[in-house]
Amino acid sequence: MKLLNDSRMQEFIVNGYVKVKAAFTPAFHESVRAQVEEIFSTTGNPGNDILPAIPQLADLFSHPAVTGALTSILGPGYAMHPHRHCHLTPPRQAGQRHHQDSYEDDQNVRHHRTRWVMAFYYPQDVNVEMGPTSVLPASQYYTRRDQAEKQEEVLLSGEAGAVTIVHYDLWHRAATNHSDRNRYMIKFLFCRMAEPNAPSWQCASPVWSEPAAYEELPRLWRSVWNWHLGNELRDDGQDDASRVGVSAGRRDNGLRVEQEVLSEAGQLENVYQLSGQGPKGSAELCERLSKEALELLDHNQAARHTNPSQLYSGFGLSAQGATAVPYLLELLRTGDWPLRAAVADILGDIGRPAGNAVPFLIDSLDDDSEWVRRNAAEALGNIGSAEPVPQLARLLVKDSCRFVRHNAALSLAKIGRDADAASSSLQMALDDTNLYVRENARLALARIHME
């Protein structure tokens, strides 16, 4: 297995993608391309069935360069998600608009910490004329198109066997195919199954190196780097306000800022700045969160594939780790449903340091709000405690919402062997009406019983 080094790992954190080469023979990739072409011409796009239709694709994701990159980014024991797709751009087809992919069968909050990635594989040489996949580097932390499109587009041309590992939220598109040849790209999804407790790449130094090409999100990048290291380190938040895209304004004890947010980047850097200010920062961020949860609700629910818990303050609270948990638990007890849902999500993004929240998240599994139950079920898997296994098992077979069942099954898979008591419920879930609930249950059973 060929792990990433510090430089390439930091490149991924900043740019949102890293390219590797599955160096099989040209005949291997040509065989895949020919089979894809045959399938499209006879039965159409196979969707999720591309892997059983072309079993040799499994060899691709066993290649040392590919497994090394995925292990470096997602940690050991990562899982291939059952959703996959083969993208065809025929000759002369116009390019797409830049977009972020929706999360398959759940509208997850877009998080900065890397728990999901995509892998883009070319089974043939793709030059710039053929409409390669295009990415906007360093755009994965933005939800606003106007901010993302400030980044300079990069066309991912490459030889057959090129595999690009992409942060799930990176803005991307298929470019225009100006050639007379079909262009194929096969997309696979991968999911982190355990929170980091040490570097999973070839780490020579824990020191973060500021990138030369970008400068807008230094605190965010350092926070994500430290999370990947398995640390809860935070910077002190004392940089000059001009570095984070806010006007200086009035400060109360160096905390409260009467700010004019100049950009989404500035807003993100501001909440990461507050994350470094201890309990005072927690109080300020929770106050903002309470307002955002209601003020942004209509906006967050207006479009498809969105989550009402997509709130800027949540990123700062996640970065605070255990410091923020007591403040969040108070909101979980007292807030309206949009706020309760946001808090459940943030506790899950904090992960293991939010272990004290487990009993409260278990209670949230019975919340009247589907969104609270969805986010609480997901959060418990990230925290990884075995305590909620009986409640997650009950949810898996009894909750009427497929998204809740989906998240319950995936969380049981993350808990792994300690979820053995849920085995009978997981067996029942193999007959669920939803494909992804069934597949997550299958994954959970495999992880419970793996040697």
Feature locations, PLM:
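Conserved metal-binding segment of the jelly-roll/cupin
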Residues: 158-172
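Non-heme Fe(II)-dependent double-stranded beta-helix
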Residues: 1-109
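Catalytic core of non-heme Fe(II) oxygenases with the double-stranded beta-helix
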Residues: 94-157, 200
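Structural detector for internal amphipathic alpha-helices that build alpha-solenoid repeat scaffolds
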Residues: 227-248, 265-280, 299-322, 327-330, ...
